[in-house]
C-alpha cells in the first residue's frame, strides 16, 4: 500500500452501489497480472442517514457527519483519494458539510466530486450532445444537483414528467432497488425505462443515470439508441 496511492470508496448508500463502484475500478484498470491492480479500500457504512430524507426536511441529521467519519476511516487505512458512491450525497448541503468536517480533522484526503466529473465526462465523450436527460431521486431534482452544473456547461437538463416512477423503482419496500439489488427486479427495471422514455420524448441525446443504484437496474450502455451515462464510470 505504501508504494502505490490507494483509492478509497465510501459506500453503504445502498451497500451494492459501493461494491459496484469497486468492480468498475477493477474492470477499467488495464493489467497483465494481479499485482498491476490499484490498491482499493471499500468502507461500506449502512448507518449513513438517508440523503434525500435530509434534503427534503424529513430528517434534521446531516448525513455528512457520518460520511466524514467513513472518509477518515478510509484515510487512516491508507487512502489518499476517495469517491462517494451516492449521487445525492454530493448536494452542497451534504458534500460541503462533509468537507468541513474533514478540514476540522486536518484531513488531507482528496475527495472527488461525482457530479463535476460526470458533466466533464459528458462534454468530453459526447461533445455534440446538448439536451441531457436526468434520472435521479427527489433530492437530486429538488436541489438541482445536475441541472446547475449542466446549465453552467451550456447544456440543457431534462427531467421526467413525474418523479414517482423513479421513487418506486428505488425505494419500494418489496421491488425497489434498495430492497432487491442482486438481482434487481424486473418491476424496477421497467419503471426506470418508463422514466427514460419521458426524457427521450423531450429530445434527450444522452441520459444520466443519476442515482448510483440505477445502473444496477440498467447496466446497458444505451437505451433505444440513446447513450446511458453511468456516473460511476467517470469517477
Please place each PLM-identified region on the residue numbering:
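Non-catalytic structural scaffold of enzyme domains
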Residues: 1-235
Amino acid at each position: 500500500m505504501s508504494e502505490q496511492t490507494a483509492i478509497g470508496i465510501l459506500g453503504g448508500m445502498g451497500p451494492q452501489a459501493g461494491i459496484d463502484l469497486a468492480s468498475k475500478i477493477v474492470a477499467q484498470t488495464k493489467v497483465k497480472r494481479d499485482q498491476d491492480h490499484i490498491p482499493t479500500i471499500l468502507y461500506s457504512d449502512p448507518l449513513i442517514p438517508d440523503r434525500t430524507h435530509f434534503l427534503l426536511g424529513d430528517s434534521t441529521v446531516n448525513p455528512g457527519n457520518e460520511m466524514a467519519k467513513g472518509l477518515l476511516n478510509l484515510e487512516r487505512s491508507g487512502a489518499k483519494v476517495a469517491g462517494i458512491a451516492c449521487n445525492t450525497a454530493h448536494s452542497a448541503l451534504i458534500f460541503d458539510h462533509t468537507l468541513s468536517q474533514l478540514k476540522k480533522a486536518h484531513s488531507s484526503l482528496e475527495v472527488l466530486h461525482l457530479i463535476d466529473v460526470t458533466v466533464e465526462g459528458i462534454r468530453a465523450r459526447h461533445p455534440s450532445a446538448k439536451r441531457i436527460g436526468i434520472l435521479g431521486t427527489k433530492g437530486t431534482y429538488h436541489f438541482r444537483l445536475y441541472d446547475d452544473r449542466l446549465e453552467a456547461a451550456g447544456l440543457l437538463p431534462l427531467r421526467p414528467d413525474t418523479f414517482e416512477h423513479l421513487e418506486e423503482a428505488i425505494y419500494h419496500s418489496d421491488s425497489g432497488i434498495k430492497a432487491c439489488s442482486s438481482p434487481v427486479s424486473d418491476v424496477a427495471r421497467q419503471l426506470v425505462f418508463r422514466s427514460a422514455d419521458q426524457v427521450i420524448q423531450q429530445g434527450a441525446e444522452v441520459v444520466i443515470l443519476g442515482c448510483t443504484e440505477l445502473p444496477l437496474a440498467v447496466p446497458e450502455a444505451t437505451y433505444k439508441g440513446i447513450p446511458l451515462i453511468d456516473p460511476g464510470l467517470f469517477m
